[in-house]
Amino acid sequence: MMQLKEKYKKEIIPKMKEKFGYKNDLAAPKLEKAVVNVGFGKHVKEKEYVKHIQEILEKITGQKPILTKAKKSISPFKLRQGMIIGAKVTLRGNRMYDFVEKLINITFPRVRDFRGINEKSVDKTGNLSVGFKEHLAFPEIAVDDVENSYGLEICIATTAKSREEGLELFKLLKFPLKNS
């Protein structure tokens, strides 16, 4: 599954150098990390639900998730400081490239009513944020075994210096972006 990394080195870097006038290969923006995040929401106190989500995240990413804790108390939400409120996985290197390739080629086409990622999902520093309403689009999840579906967020960080560089990188990587 290392085709994306090889494609980046052989095809994308020369195109980025030509378009933006970089003198060095290392000046071209590249993918830095991919973060997959799930918030537990109203199920915070249900230990079985938390454990189930951790297992699903591990299946999807191939890496054990870490639990995220609340930074401060918010009484209307019945949230206390230090309470576990979600789980996240940070992927770097080869695992990140494998995950992003799977995301582009397998997961996005499996999403119901998917019409592309809005270009506004790329921020001013060239990072992409995508939210999924249900986790069933991932190939590791057997639809028959699922009791309830939940959403997750994926943030892909790049070394791009501007939004234009980030957008061009994602277009060259064949992300299904649509014009806003």
Predicted regions and their residues:
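Ribosome-associated RNA-binding proteins
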Residues: 1-180
